[in-house]
Amino acid sequence: MSKARRWVIIVLSLAVLVMIGINMAEKDDTAQVVVNNNDPTYKSEHTDTLVYNPEGALSYRLIAQHVEYYSDQAVSWFTQPVLTTFDKDKIPTWSVKADKAKLTNDRMLYLYGHVEVNALVPDSQLRRITTDNAQINLVTQDVTSEDLVTLYGTTFNSSGLKMRGNLRSKNAELIEKVRTSYEIQNKQTQP
């Protein structure tokens, strides 16, 4: 090989290496996308969500005016949520309303502001529950509150702090500072 040919090959090889280096350097300078974890992953208006149990029966329905989902926390926030629970026969049993709600990945629904739980079946002795904040396990339908709770039944009203109950079994227990009033119906006998 002649000296001139060697020099041409060396110069061309160096030129190729320089071009590869420049190309690699340009790729490193690309702007990285900045993700703000305070922004929701997605937003939705006027949502209607139906959730079914593993057997395929309707478990609950969750309607909201506005929903924001945060994927980094696996949390959904609902504005003006209305939850309707269903029994095994697909009959609506309870309606739950609040100002805001947070649904976590473990299917816990945290309700905030003007929480109201209303019975939708006529045979329930417990007709309505009101409180400021509550938590509902959407799998077991256990409901709890650490705030002042008022229970309205067919023949009683009861209020107290801290409540534990279960929507499926239609019961609620007030834990502290309980005050109850009963309506006693007089039976009139005919002489």
Swiss-Prot record:
**Could you tell me the superkingdom of the organism this chain comes from?**
Bacteria
Q: What is the effect of changing G56V?
A: Impairs LPS transport. Does not abolish interaction with LptA
Q: Which GO terms describe its molecular function?
A: glycolipid transfer activity; identical protein binding; lipopolysaccharide transmembrane transporter activity
User: Among its keywords, does the record have Cell inner membrane?
Assistant: yes
Q: What's the gene?
A: lptC
Per the record, what phenotype accompanies loss of this gene's function?
Answer: Leads to irreversible cell damage, growth arrest and an extreme sensitivity to SDS.
Q: Any stretches that span the bilayer, and where are they?
A: 7-25
Q: Where in the cell is it found?
A: Cell inner membrane
Identify its membrane topology class: Single-pass membrane protein
Name of the protein:
Lipopolysaccharide export system protein LptC
Disulphide-bridged cysteine pairs: none
Keyword Transmembrane in the entry? The reply is yes
Query: Principal place where this protein is found?
Result: membrane
Q: Per the UniProt entry, what are the Gene Ontology biological process annotations, in alphabetical order? A: Gram-negative-bacterium-type cell outer membrane assembly; lipopolysaccharide transport
Further information:
Interacts with the LptBFG ABC transporter complex, but does not affect its ATPase activity.
User: What family is it from?
Assistant: Belongs to the LptC family.
List cellular component terms (GO): membrane; outer membrane-bounded periplasmic space; plasma membrane; transporter complex
Key words of the record? Cell inner membrane, Cell membrane, Membrane, Transmembrane, Transmembrane helix
What role is this protein assigned?
Involved in the assembly of lipopolysaccharide (LPS). Required for the translocation of LPS from the inner membrane to the outer membrane. Facilitates the transfer of LPS from the inner membrane to the periplasmic protein LptA. Could be a docking site for LptA.
User: What effect is documented for mutating G153R?
Assistant: Impairs LPS transport. Fails to interact with LptA
Binding partners and assembly = Component of the lipopolysaccharide transport and assembly complex. Interacts with LptA and the LptBFG transporter complex. When overexpressed, can form homodimers in vivo.
